[in-house]
Amino acid sequence: MYLIDTYDVIVVGAGHAGCEAALAAARMGCRTLLTTISLDNVAMMPCNPAVGGPGKSHLVKEIDALGGEMGIAADATAVQMRMLNRGKGPAVYALRAQSDKGAYHRYMKNVVENTDNLDLKQVQVMDIIVEDGKCVGINTELDEEYRAKAVILCTGTYLDSMIIIGDTMYSGGPNGMRPSVGLSANLKKHGLEILRFKTGTPSRVDRRSLHLEGMELEEGDPENHAFSFMSERKDRNKRNCWLTYTNEKTHDIIRENIMRAPKYAGKIHGIGARYCPSIEDKVVRFADKDRHQLFVEPEGLDTTEMYVQGMSTSMPIDVQYAFLRTIPGFEDVKMMRPAYAIEYDLLDPLQLYPTLEVIKLPGLYSAGQSNGTSGYEEAAAQGLVAGINAALKIQGKDPFILARHEAYIGSLVDDLVTKGADEPYRMMTSRSEYRLILRQDNADLRLTEKGHSIGLVGEERYARFLERKKKYEEAMDYIRTQRFTPKEEINRALESMGTAPLTTGTGADQILKRPEMTYWKMMEMLGCPAFDEEAVEEMEITVKYEGYIARQEAAVRKAARMENEKLPPDMDYLSLDGISTEAKQKMDKIRPLSLGQAARIPGVSPADISVLMVYVKQRKGKKGAE
């Protein structure tokens, strides 16, 4: 091996996790190396050409609030934007951007190449270097050696990956890229537990071969949206999407050929995602449904490739063509890329601390799909956490761990390191018990102060945040202090808006709480002053959902007591009496950092936690006596 260079941080893999990890470490002052199998692969979108959606948009907003890049990149390369779940409450509003995949890759590669302290190199990593029980670098297939104080694995779906299409199986990565061969075996050699998962992607079809008039048009929102608090809210709609459906003919062809599907023929052994099933799985599992919706989405501005969302499959090519041509608008379809399944290795995330550092190998971190998640947003969020914590550890500072009540990112990481992943993990709003206070609209109010305190949020972004916070506080101050008396002109205005007149002096916030009332109506009819649009949106939600928010905040205070009760890192769980064997074994493996985390481990009962609390108090008493 030939020593090429020495860094503070080395990031293996330049997908969505790797880019955020490398950018975070470099921006926090660490000399960083980002490696990739191909420079043409940086921040590639191997599956859907989109960012955001239910649960995921919250992650993107939080990444942005902490100083990450994904939100800005998504805004810069969007070809359509829509706010989903508008018929539900604001806790589950979800912004989704249709992305230009090529532009997204180019944008992120340019950011990486122009970031101080950051080198980007095309290498195939074969081994991690371990000395004295610590990870201290990497070796490449060309016998190059790079040393570092921390290594972050962001290998995505590339570890010993296998492409599967019908009877055809071959070693390969997504979209015809090379797989990462050798690194998985090396990780096993160092005592790490490896799982194997499966995911899939639909075919890409030629737009020119489609009859779009036979489908339902899906346009972007007329309102202006943005993921990043640094981006201008403007019209980003440049392309349309379309909606169509499968039918009984489609399903009949799939049923007739079901034993040619690799999963049903016993050729796929990796565990697939429950929330993103293949079309053959949908037909089998939901036999009562006579159709399934398909969204036809552009891959970019300068390509005719269209992504068929909802049609993931690993069926043989002839079967793919047969069922595609039964779909309205697809009668003459031409495939440009076939659908496929991909199997890949990953680390069991139960081997990680909440900092995403590997428990058994200090100095080694893991983030993204190599931890068992699915999706670009989940990967990017983990990359950010790993990059931040690697930098903080090198700088001798306290770790950065977001609690479940502070961010969706906190729930994501906690679920992974506490409960593990028995299938590709997908973030959903239902995974957070605090979703009413963890909305996408208040991500910066929750997290930007934290990002600034660790040195990731720059002064320009922080100044904008302070200005936005000031505008919100001004709006809140007005709505809390302004009162209206039951004057004739006031009551006439209220009645004209379809709401009850006043009988006594009433606070503006109480009027705003009325279901039929908005602040824009109060401006128009009651002469209320104008405030910043985003501040008004935030203020309305705060006021209208005040009671629910107060209840969640009370639950947060209760949970915080358990989270603040820290567990010693050297606790000998196996020697504790009065705790079930299963609980002792799981806590010994997971090494929870707090009583709160220990209580969330599957198999650890409330009785086990009660006994553990006694041990912790006894230990504190002994230390105090010393």
What residue ranges belong to the model's regions?
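Core beta-strand elements of the Rossmann-like FAD/NAD(P) dinucleotide-binding domain
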Residues: 5-7, 141-150
